[in-house]
Amino acid sequence: MPSFEEVRAAFPVLEQYAYLNAGTNGPLPRVAAEAMIAEELVDVAQGRGGEPYFSRALGMRDQVRAKLAALLSVEPTQVALTRSTTDGCNIVLAGLDLGPDDEVVTSDVEHFGLIGPLHASSARIVTAPEDRILEAVTDRTRVIAISHVSWVTGNTLDPVRIKAETGLPILVDGAQSAGVIPIETGALDYYAVSCQKWLCGPDVTGALVVARPEDLRVALPSYFAQSEHQPDGSYVAREGAERFDSGWIGTPSLAGLSKALDVAHEWRFERVAEMAAKCRAALAERFEVITKPNQAGLVTFRPTSDPTKLVERLRGDGVIVRELPRRNLIRVSCGYWTSESDLERLVTGLA
């Protein structure tokens, strides 16, 4: 098993920056970048067509799907390849055919990647504080749609418990949880993730877990999501969650994502928890910390000065964090690659 120092060395950006913003985009591993470049050069030299190209690309899709399934504790047949968490939310909410008589319960601190697709549906949206979701459920509630980890507060909800207590279908935004905390999605209906955040993959990569693919209508068909199609547009959807694949993903992105998924090791969840706890404790000495103890990888605090200027100043010091616009908050992302030195640079920069 590689040491922490060996894993940290896999990320070139950490040679210069205290990179504490995986909640937006994770650091790209060297092996992922090298794989992307190598695959791009193959495409340049050999073209992007013909049987060898498509066989290679489809094989890479299968490989990535299997790795994501293992990470999310499901079968590969339950994983669709998407471009983002938002993609996954749109696929599910469009396929559920919600009407004005249907209610969807969600929290009041959701990302637009979930709340946007919700408002594009015809359902009535009921919002509640993240700790009062169950109280908002009524006889009209058809779906519960929540984040596993809030992108704002950094607090963690328990979608498995909510599912067990209500018996309702549940759509989970897993953008801030996949790769951060252990995930058992087997008891859940729909789980959408982004792969460029904590999984450290290339841009425009994501996944959607669909527990029972045959129960969700294909509302957004894509070219490679059918087993056959006719000139008139009729088609036969692929078996399993592949029927919900968003579309074509280039071989460079697939190669990079496959390598990125191999970088993390078994101790990553413990390391994230340890670094987040240390970060929270250090910030709590001087600031109001919004994130409760023992959550996930995000730590959100309220600065005592202008957050925009403070984030800019920190960047000048080589510390990368995220301002949460219109909320007067700053968010710190602690990954399995985060070191004590990174946190010391953050604290020093805030002085």
Task: Kindly give the residue locations of the regions a language model identified.
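Pyridoxal 5′-phosphate
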Residues: 1-351
